[in-house]
């Protein structure tokens, strides 16, 4: 997706040569017009696939998933919660996920009321690097007896093993921008 790549080049920043900071348009301040284009792009990529629900993880995936939902017939968006909370049902699916950027593990939880056996679930997230978050969501979908029909990623670090981990589960991955390297402290797309 060329508009996304241009935005990454023009407005993204590299930290320590390996962390891409895109908080000014994707995961702190949100460029709604770009989000709309991203939602349309996911609809094109997954055209012809029955989608009953979209699953993401808090917090950065929520805006992307919610805007994408309108292009899939306004299907419900469910998001995995990263923290235990009094307002989360005791009956929940959970999976442990390691966060590379936060350098810690946490449990992702989804109420059993929101995922049902037989549902076809599209997973959407902002980044794919090592594949831990997506793998955790796939695990949750399968615990529910639902079917993960694909993973839609806004920005993939193609030089990390996330894609191969997801594809090893037999699940299709569609990324809108694939970064091949951060050589010379610059973003290089594949």
Swiss-Prot record:
Residues holding 5-phospho-alpha-D-ribose 1-diphosphate: 129-133
Enzyme Commission code: 2.4.2.22
Example of a GO biological process term: purine ribonucleoside salvage
Catalytic activity: XMP + diphosphate = xanthine + 5-phospho-alpha-D-ribose 1-diphosphate
Keywords annotated in UniProt: Cytoplasm, Glycosyltransferase, Purine salvage, Transferase
Pathway: Purine metabolism; XMP biosynthesis via salvage pathway; XMP from xanthine: step 1/1
Listed GO MF terms: xanthine phosphoribosyltransferase activity
Localization, UniProt: Cytoplasm
Quaternary state and interactors: Homodimer.
Protein name as it appears in the record: Xanthine phosphoribosyltransferase
